[in-house]
Each structure stands twice: as structure tokens, then as C-alpha cells.
């Protein structure tokens, strides 16, 4: 079983009086730097001067400096910029300004596992990887809790690498939820596999294949969209909340029987062999090499794939369907002219007859509410 750490296993004092440089102010950089600051750590954000992120960080009350200046003298450098630009920023602005004994922290194992970055031997190399998008991390932190995270130690020059990783996790609030220990290789390869085989690649391919099958057989594209894409969120929410069995027990018996009895016909032995091959290619570094090459060449292959996806029938139909659910803001009503204050009524003298007020009609009696029929037992 995995080793899981909690609040009592981490100490923010480990980085008391230390300088933490966060490189980047995107989804992860923004959330992590602000949470670390609010947890009492001394944080400076390293950015390109004059960019939008620079202004955004300033507006959010962060100390900001050019990347090279932020790294100089820093005890911890958190590299929270996209995988594809880490190598260039490392060589040009981070590595030349490192001090001995500093800790280099990553939120993803890609750069170290696939040798995009090769740190010197006289620094700690750690990972603190929250399992959530940045905005959610920040929201949960402000609510007094935290999101789960992973930690790993690749290189322990000082002997304090794990303590520093746990301190960063506590600064984010992650130790309140639970922090799992892993390795850079395990995180990097499993993360890429999950994205490609299931979350981003597998699911979208399955959705499109289902949609195209129905449309090809003469079904209306709008109906196919609802059945193969729109309703997916309902199912995923049930799984995320309580696991597979929570989903099976909350769908109809027909859906449960059909799903369990036919799923191996779709994800069959051939599909599973393809997954094995995909994982082998990831572990061997084949995918990393291909991605780094495309990123360094201007992302031409990625852009071509994006264009093809954007022009697909399911995307065109999806825009139509989603527009049906848009809530348009009602036009602002014109302000009515201010009413004049009513004139004060003259006081009625004692003994004088009061002005007659028309009697109100009695409200009609409501018919007694009918009892709702008892619900049948069983699934919705």
C-alpha cells in the first residue's frame, strides 16, 4: 500500500526564513504561490517582466521579479511552467543562478524522468504534485482544507528533501487531505498513460466513435450527441463521488445490465493490447521525444490535430446543442421615475367619522392538497 502523509507529518518551520521562488503564474503557479504565501512562507514569483502574468501577480499582492533574479539566493525553486518550455527556461535562467543546497521542486515528473532537465548533484530534486487544477486548489485552501497531492524525492543532497516536499504540501493545505509518496518515474509515466489511454485520448475517441456510429446509421446528430457525449457528465459525477458501484446502483437496471454484459465487446482484448503498447512507448521515452520535438518545432502537428478536431461534426453539433442551455442575461429594465412622497393625511378630529374603506373580499379557500402516491422501490 502507498505511504500517506497528513498534517502531523509536515512542518512549515522547515522553510521558516527561507526564500521560495515560484517560476510561473499560470493555473498551478498562481494557486500554489498564493497558498504558500498565505501559509506564511516567503514567496517571490519569477516571471518575464512586462507580461500579463507579471501584472496579474502584482494585482494579487505577490512579490514579483524576473526569473533569474527570483532564483538568485532562493532556497526552493518551484518550476510551475508548462513541460514544453521548462528545458529552455532551466538552461537560460534557472541553472546559472542556482545556489548549492537549493531544492528544485516540480509539479510533474516529465522533465526529470525524460531528461529534459538534468540538475547538478549539489541540489535537492523533489516533486509536490497536487491532484487538482490550480483554481480548485485555491478555492479549497480558502475553505480551510486542501486537495490531495503526491510527493517524490529524486535527489537528496541536503538530507532534508522529503521534509521540504512535505512542507510545500502543507503550505498548499494538501496534508489536510492526504499526501501520497511516489517516484518521479511512476508519476510521469502513469500520468501520461492516464491522459492518453483514458482521460483525454481514450474517452474522446470512444465518444466520437459512438457518435459517428449512430450518425452513419441514420440517427439525427443531435440525438447522437445527447446519448454519447452530453450525458457522460452525469455518469462521471456518480463514479467520482462513490466509485463504480455507486454509478451502477444509480442507473437503471437496463443500463446496468447492458453496460456490464457488453463492455468487453467494445474495450476488448485488442484494445487492452494497444494500452500495453502505449504504456511501453511512454516508459521507453518514445512519446516524450515526439512531443518535445513537435513543441520545439512550433507545435505544427498539435495545431493540425486541433484543427481537425475543431472541424469534426460532433464539435459543430455540440455548439448548437450547448447554445440551447445558455442562459441569456435579461435586458436591464429602465428605471422608473422616482415617486413623489405621498402627502400627509389630515389628522382626523376626535369624534369625526373615519373615511370608509372598501371591505376586502375573502380569499377563496384552497382545495385540500392531494397526497403524493408512494414511490416504488428500485432505481431511478
Task: Show the residue positions of the predicted features.
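Glycine-rich adenosine-cofactor-binding loop
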Residues: 19-32
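NAD(P)-binding Rossmann-fold cofactor-contacting core
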Residues: 30-31, 37-60
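Interdomain hinge/lid region at the active-site interface
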Residues: 209-212, 216-217, 242-304
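Low-complexity, polybasic segments enriched for Lys interleaved with small residues
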Residues: 337-374
Amino acid at each position: 500500500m502507498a505511504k500517506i502523509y497528513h498534517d502531523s507529518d509536515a512542518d512549515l518551520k522547515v522553510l521558516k526564513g527561507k526564500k521560495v521562488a515560484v517560476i510561473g503564474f499560470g493555473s498551478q503557479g498562481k494557486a500554489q504561490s498564493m497558498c504558500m504565501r498565505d501559509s506564511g512562507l516567503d514567496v517571490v514569483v519569477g516571471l518575464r517582466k512586462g507580461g500579463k502574468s507579471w501584472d496579474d501577480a502584482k494585482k494579487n499582492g505577490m512579490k514579483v521579479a524576473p526569473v533569474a533574479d527570483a532564483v538568485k539566493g532562493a532556497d526552493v525553486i518551484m518550476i510551475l511552467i508548462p513541460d514544453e518550455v521548462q528545458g529552455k527556461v532551466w538552461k537560460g535562467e534557472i541553472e546559472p543562478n542556482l545556489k548549492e543546497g537549493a531544492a528544485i521542486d516540480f509539479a510533474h515528473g516529465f522533465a526529470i524522468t525524460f531528461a529534459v532537465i538534468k540538475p547538478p548533484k549539489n541540489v535537492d530534486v523533489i516533486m509536490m504534485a497536487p491532484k487538482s487544477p490550480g483554481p480548485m486548489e485555491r478555492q479549497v485552501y480558502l475553505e480551510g482544507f486542501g486537495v490531495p497531492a503526491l510527493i517524490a524525492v529524486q535527489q537528496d543532497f541536503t538530507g532534508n528533501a522529503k521534509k521540504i516536499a512535505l512542507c510545500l504540501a502543507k503550505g498548499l493545505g494538501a496534508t489536510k487531505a492526504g499526501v501520497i509518496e511516489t517516484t518521479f518515474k511512476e508519476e510521469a509515466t502513469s500520468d501520461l498513460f492516464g491522459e492518453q489511454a483514458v482521460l483525454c485520448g481514450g474517452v474522446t475517441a470512444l465518444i466520437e466513435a459512438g457518435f459517428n456510429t449512430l450518425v452513419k446509421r441514420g440517427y439525427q446528430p443531435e440525438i447522437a450527441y445527447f446519448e454519447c457525449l452530453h450525458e457522460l457528465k452525469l455518469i462521471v459525477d456518480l463514479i467520482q463521488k462513490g466509485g463504480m458501484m455507486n454509478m451502477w446502483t444509480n442507473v437503471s437496471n437496463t443500463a446496468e445490465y447492458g453496460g456490464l454484459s457488453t463492455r468487453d465487446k467494445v474495450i476488448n482484448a485488442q484494445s487492452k493490447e494497444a494500452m500495453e503498447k502505449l504504456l511501453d512507448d511512454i516508459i521507453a521515452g518514445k512519446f516524450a521525444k515526439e512531443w518535445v520535438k513537435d513543441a520545439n518545432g512550433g507545435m505544427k502537428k498539435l495545431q493540425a490535430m486541433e484543427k481537425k478536431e475543431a472541424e469534426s461534426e460532433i464539435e459543430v453539433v455540440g455548439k448548437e446543442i450547448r447554445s440551447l442551455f445558455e442562459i441569456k442575461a435579461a435586458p436591464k429594465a429602465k428605471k422608473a421615475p422616482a415617486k413623489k412622497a405621498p402627502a400627509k393625511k389630515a389628522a382626523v378630529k376626535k369624534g369625526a367619522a373615519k373615511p370608509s374603506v372598501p371591505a376586502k373580499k375573502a380569499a377563496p379557500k384552497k382545495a385540500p392538497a392531494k397526497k403524493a402516491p408512494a414511490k416504488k422501490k428500485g432505481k431511478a
